[in-house]
Amino acid sequence: MPAPFVHLRVHSAYSLAESTLRLKSIMALAGGDSQPAVAITDTSNMFGALEFSEKMREAGVQPIIGLECIIADSRGRGEVVLLAQSEAGYEALCRHNSRALLDVEGGDDPMIQLESLAQDNEGMILLTGGAVNGFVGAAAAEGQTALVDERLSALVQAFPGRVYVELQRHGLDVERRAEPVLLNVAVAADIPLVATNDCRFEKRDMVMPHDVLLCIGNGRKLAEDDRPRFTPEHYFKTAEEMASLFADIPEAIRNTLVIAQRCSAMAEMRKPILPPFESEAGLGEEDELQRQAKEGLEERLHGHVFSEGMDEAAREAAAAPYRERLEFELGVINQMGFPGYFLIVADFIQWAKARDIPVGPGRGSGAGSVVAWALSITDLDPLRWGLLFERFLNPERVSMPDFDIDFCQDRREEVIGYVQEKYGFDKVAQIITFGSLQARAALRDVGRVLEMPYSQVDRIAKLIPSNPANPVTIAQALETEEELRKHRREDEQVGELIDISMKIEGLYRHASTHAAGLVIGDRPLEQLVPLYRDPRSPMPVTQFNMKWVENAGLVKFDFLGLKTLTVLQRAVAFLAQRGVEIDLETIPLDDAKTFEMLSAGDTVGV
């Protein structure tokens, strides 16, 4: 039987350095307690919206997509929770969150103007915020009843029938001061109540590791009295515990179920979405790809396959396997629905080459495509080197094609700028990545927070085997490293260091930007995914990481900046100044002098 309560304010590990609740933990806690639904309401972001939706759906728990955000009016600001009721509400949530993050300056908090929210909130429910810094709750805690009335009136007018006065009981004095004020105004204005628990960790005994995590995120020490902290009550309570906590206000518990029943939206996975490729000849994508590929192949055959003195019969014999392979590949590409992808990639590579921007010859499985060779995406003859197209695209293994494309590091931004101009600045974005607390970093950060001697912590951290390709966890190291086990047994402080580190190991610590990946949409990207701003880049960044942005339907294009190409271009330019002309593409791959130079071991790289 479903539990009679739903958590509507849950911070996952995507609330960076604010929560220890991994999505798997939320799934287990809600499912294990038979809670019919659960909301994710991360701080000013929707990083985990799609992943959360899929994981909860797998567990048979209804996902509710939400957001804890700061809203502002002429009197100040405060936090509220927004929940998506419908697809329109989810899209509005993405819009508001994207714009708040893209507009933020410096170290300011992202915020949404109430005026803007009032004009665009179809399909959203609003919870009025807690007593600590809530838009309504904080004013109630300070006894500012006029401001409470004013703000509640504005919210009810903006969200007719979709506002709930939020009550929280974490044992804080501000909550006890705010509650009678909130109850009075809610009853007087006939606004429904709802009980929430601001969930930040799994169980009460996780309060210490959570405190340490907060200190890591804020650069504080555990012993500091004025540091941010949460109470032991900020854990993921069971439905029974919540019902007992609010036994005197049962409607506040019942309304969690009412809200869950009103919410039917979730972030959806989509098939790949690409912008339409506009052919100058007015052809459809399949016909345009066939035209460009056949014309390009003939140029390649004349430049690389046919030799002087070949008669017509010899040329036809040499060309036959290439033309046959081209037709086969075009059939697969069209069958799988990817002609537009090849045309888009070919377009920006041809643009770069026309402007003497060095482009790599091709690497990875994409080098096995004759179509890619014909379009000048790659410069390697797949038949000459026996490369297989099926490693790149295979109808039996449906996945997006993925060319690894290298550009001169100094001029990569020019190519990205061209793509932005061609498809629209609001339709192109970089992809987010998340840095996590791996074993050694976790130990060092926890040691700093606990104010342990650096030399001692460093010695312990170095007992974790270093393997960047497959990082070793603390638990794995304890199985193999006797010295680490000995320190844990014999030194109580080291034991505490290791135990806390194990509990926060793997949690996300910060967000950054994927080094090469870009997505290009067929519409403004905020209509498809929430967006984020990396302070180090002027370009928008998707809030979903590479795996989940592709599941959301966006296609990744790699724009890798390769320093080697820059060095080669400069070398060719320096030689030209001395009257020596070199074409890198015509240097034979079996050049003896090149191998002699490489064998001497005097090169930086190959």
Model regions and ranges:
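Alpha-helical scaffold/interaction cores of sigma-54-like transcription cofactors
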Residues: 1-606
